[in-house]
Amino acid sequence: MSSKYYYLVACLPELSLEDSKLSYTVADFKTEIYNGLSASDRKLIDLFYLKFDNANVLKLLKDKEAEIDKRGNYSAEELTEYISILREGGEISPKEFPVYLSTFITDYLNTPAESTVLHEDHLATLYYEYAMKCGNKFVAAWFEFNLNINNILVAFTSRKFKWDIASNIVGNTEVCEALRTSSARDFGLSGEVDVFESLVKISEITELVEREKKLDALRWNWMEDAIFFDYFTVERIFAFLLKLEMIERWISLDKERGNQLFRSIIESLKNDVQIPAEFR
């Protein structure tokens, strides 16, 4: 039976995507609330924070002295030690370190320098597959939803610039397969993916910050619908964290800086004929 968090959920602040300041952060949650959750629910919440560990692992593999994002589940010292163990051919218990990260680090260390493998894509594939097997219906659905909308947008961009679509799709879901193989205008997905038409409209927005805002609004509304009947559960707490991180990101990214960032991404897309990790 799942745990109920009546007092905790009742005390969580109301959030809006338009909030311009926060008195609470995802880092605060980790230090103040995380340990009050059940062991099984902490594992679900760990999936949220693993996104920061993913970025940290990539940084440390390239530079062991790199500054990491402290919002992750693991310290720089822990990650460096795990990388060292795997570099020497050792093994790490899945109870101690997620198996997908061990797999990724091993694959990274064994990849020839001349390889054209995009490490960010490989890591994203492993992460999504790992998260979608978590056993929680809402959390698994969230990761699949996010994977699908990211891939659909990447497919639109690839088709627009006449790039190979299949090589830019991340993951192995039915939607991924349709995007890789279908030549139909809608990839055969307009009746399969509820938000497909919304994504078509969003992809046509030329003002890049507005487009990203619309995407976050789409994600926000999806969460609201998905947890409508989950009142005091870990699902509502997980959604709270997702919303909190969204607002944090927008507060730290003002409109002018946002336009510069996204225009540089588009420019790199045109110049490199590759889809960088930031665009996914």
Predicted regions and their residues:
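Extended alpha-helical surfaces
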Residues: M1-R280
